[in-house]
């Protein structure tokens, strides 16, 4: 038997795979976006950029930007009754209007 991998990307093939249309798009605009505290964002992981990538469990979660931490942003995400904090690069975040 082969030992099962327990790395940070294990079990995430479907979540971290781009479609043909997504492979053609440029991500430079998403890399340069800026957020201010209080902005609502969705975590949308960009699989081609590994720096500042949040854990794949948080793919699709929404939260509020708490502040900047280095080149990344600290996002408060509600999981049940808890607020968990995810540190993610701006390329892995999308602004939610509203």
Swiss-Prot record:
Cellular component per GO, a single term: ribonucleoprotein complex
Positions of the UniProt region annotated as Disordered: 1-31
Record-level Gene Ontology MF annotations: structural constituent of ribosome
Coiled-coil regions listed: none
Superkingdom of the organism of origin: Archaea
InterPro entries from the UniProt entry: Ribosomal_eL21, Ribosomal_eL21_arc, Ribosomal_eL21_CS, Ribosomal_eL21_sf, Translation_prot_SH3-like_sf
GO BP, one annotated term: translation
Record keywords: Ribonucleoprotein, Ribosomal protein
Database matches in NCBIfam families: PRK04306.1 (NF003303)
Family: Belongs to the eukaryotic ribosomal protein eL21 family.
The protein's name: Large ribosomal subunit protein eL21
Record organism: Thermoplasma volcanium (strain ATCC 51530 / DSM 4299 / JCM 9571 / NBRC 15438 / GSS1)
């Amino acid at each position: 038997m082969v030992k099962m991998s327990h790395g940070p990307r294990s079990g995430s093939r479907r979540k971290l795979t781009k479609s043909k249309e997504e492979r053609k798009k440029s991500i430079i605009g998403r890399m340069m976006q800026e957020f201010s505290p209080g902005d609502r964002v969705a975590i949308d992981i960009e699989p081609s950029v590994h720096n500042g990538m949040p854990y794949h469990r948080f793919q699709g979660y929404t939260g509020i930007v708490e502040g900047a931490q280095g080149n990344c942003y600290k996002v408060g995400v509600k999981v049940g009754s808890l607020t968990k904090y995810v540190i993610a690069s701006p390329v892995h975040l999308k602004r939610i209007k509203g």
